[in-house]
Amino acid sequence: MKIRVLLLFCLISFQITAAQTLSPTAEISVLTIGQGGSLNDAFGHNGFRINDKAQDIDIVFDYGRFPFNEPGFYLNFARGKLSYSIGVDSFKDVNNFYVWQNRTIKEQVLNLEQAEKQALYNFLLNNYKPENRDYLYDFFYDNCATRIRDVANTALGDEITFNTPLDYKPQTFRTLIHNNLNKNSWGSLGIDIALGSVI
């Protein structure tokens, strides 16, 4: 009886591991979501899409889950200090949600070797475990956009090349915030006060 249970356990473990192996045709891309209408989504959003038709996988990992109903949410958001976590959803649900919100979705497929795709996917799966999900959000240095860069660098050993756009012009954090909050002057004022000299 013990041998059968052990064999069954090994078989189940193998199937879970096998199901997590990406096929050679799998693609990993970065999704960039345009601005939303409220303060907490005024700066857009980012996520990793894992699309593997051969394995019937089409999911999005993102680092933008937060406790919206937490007391003092907007004050903590304006201060740039909240507990955030990684989440995962089907691409279909993510796409439908942002289309419903009338927000743009841009996709950039990453030029990765098979081993790099698997390493990045494995990192995301491990990061999604309950004990690894949460992180302390920082308005400028640790958010859904910086996590894309940091996760890619960590999972792939700093082998990704980031190209600076030709039209890049250095700007202060304050200028960048104001560019995104012109329609919400109270939000802009609140962030200015909460962050003060940091920006």
Describe each PLM feature range.
Residues 126-199:
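Activation targets extended, charge/polar-rich intrinsically disordered C-terminal tails
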Residues 30, 48-50, 61, 108-112, ...:
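Generic structural hydrophobic/aromatic packing signal, biased to beta-strands
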Residues 27, 45, 58, 107-109, ...:
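Extracellular structured ligand-interaction cores
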Residues 23-102:
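Glycine-rich catalytic cores of cysteine/serine-nucleophile enzymes that process amide/ester linkages
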Residues 1-21:
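Bacterial Sec-dependent N-terminal signal peptides
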Residues 67-158:
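A cross-kingdom signal targeting lumenal/periplasmic-facing segments of multi-pass membrane
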